[in-house]
Curated annotation (Swiss-Prot):
It is found in: Cell membrane. It is a multi-pass membrane protein. Keywords: Cell membrane, Membrane, Transmembrane, Transmembrane helix. This is Uncharacterized protein AF_2401. GO terms for cellular component: plasma membrane. Coiled coil: none annotated. The keyword Cell membrane applies. It comes from Archaeoglobus fulgidus (strain ATCC 49558 / DSM 4304 / JCM 9628 / NBRC 100126 / VC-16). The chain crosses the membrane at residues 5-22, 37-56, 63-85, 90-112, 119-141, 151-173, 186-201.
Length: 348
């Protein structure tokens, strides 16, 4: 239990309570208007949040309280604006309050790890992100209509659909799904560029439609080229050339080889480091012909961990890291079987 977080939460709750009760005495004016129910709800939620955060097992579920804290804080803020003579903001807030609650709640749910089963966890988070995208679409559509500003409804919906699709792909293994996850950052960057272009640059080119068309098609073409290139990209390693330079000329005592192999396997499985295991295997198989040695070590040399996508969710990192560990264990098992066939009495 991390008491510092609980103490911090209690301190923050006390500071807010003290300010709300004594603001007129301290500043000569009431800035924040909150009734007893709102004060009690806000302080209780803050203390509950810090209590959940202080317990490691319950820490992820603290995010469930975020939308409630946001709504209560927003209620107090806009009630204060209403009491200070800004009713228009209060009216707008009341119209979008439901969308804000749904958006914050679903977005918070997407970060929580509910189960260790990748498929179910990915479905829960992807569904939450989809709901967050729809609520943000309606929220920005309404705000754009009320204030007469350019709408961010479609970009916000597209952003959460990108997050939902890439999060859902975490449930599946394979090159295609790994490629989908790896494109998250690029797709979000393209979305940002298109949004900035549509809102800031395109209106300035209304009298030059040819330039606008050229820019739009250039963005589409570059995006297609980048995505298709990433999908087809593969890295080939010349194992024979790598191994030939590491074949030792002297035999090493068997006990030392076992120790080096065990250390190399542990370093690779737990940390993903190939070097200790590669060197140990090359030394152990010093009498094996280079082509055969290259074939044995090919799975290790060509192995690459699946990279974590940018802005990855905590549960998503856990799934990918666990999957990488299982893949490394399979590589070690495969190599060990080959070594046992090549080296007589290898398994003592």
């Amino acid at each position: 239990m991390r008491l510092n977080k609980l103490i911090s939460g209690l301190g923050l709750a006390f500071a807010i309570y003290f300010f709300l009760l004594n603001q007129e005495r301290l500043f000569g004016e009431v800035f924040v208007v909150a009734d007893e129910m709102q004060r009690a709800a806000l302080l209780t939620l803050i203390v509950a949040y810090s209590a959940l955060a202080s317990v490691e097992r319950l820490n992820p579920f603290r995010l469930v309280l975020v939308p409630f804290i946001l709504i209560v804080s927003s209620d107090i803020t806009f009630n204060s604006l209403l009491s200070h003579g800004y009713p228009q903001y209060f009216v707008v807030y009341q119209s979008v309050r439901g969308y804000i609650a749904i958006f914050s709640g679903s977005f918070a749910f997407s970060y929580i790890r509910f189960t260790d089963k990748p498929l179910y966890q990915s479905l829960i988070s992807a569904t939450s992100l989809g709901i967050a995208g729809l609520s943000s679409y309606y929220l920005f559509s309404y705000l754009s209509e009320v204030f007469g500003l350019p709408s961010l409804a479609l970009p916000s919906l597209a952003l959460f659909l990108i997050l939902a699709v890439t999060a859902l792909s975490t449930a599946f293994e394979g090159e295609v799904f790994q490629w989908i996850r790896s494109e998250r950052t690029f797709l979000m960057l393209v979305l940002f560029i298109l949004t900035f272009y549509t809102l800031a640059i395109k209106p300035q080119l209304s009298e030059r439609p040819g330039i606008a068309d050229f820019i739009e098609w250039s963005i589409v073409a570059l995006t297609f080229i980048k995505i298709s290139r990433d999908f087809r990209r593969s890295v080939e390693v010349d194992e024979r050339e790598f191994i030939a330079s590491h074949v030792p000329k002297e035999r090493v005592f068997r006990d030392r080889l076992y120790s080096e192999l065990e250390f190399g396997e542990k370093a690779f499985v737990e940390g993903g480091s190939k070097v200790p295991l590669t060197i140990a295997l090359v030394r152990a198989l010093s009498n094996v012909e280079a082509p055969k040695l290259a074939a044995i070590l090919a799975p290790l040399i060509s192995y690459e961990d699946e990279k974590l996508p940018a802005l990855s969710f905590p549960w998503e990192r856990r799934i990918i890291e666990s999957r990488n560990r299982r893949r490394r264990e399979k590589v070690v098992e495969r190599i060990r079987a080959e070594v046992m066939r090549e080296v007589k009495d290898f398994n003592r």
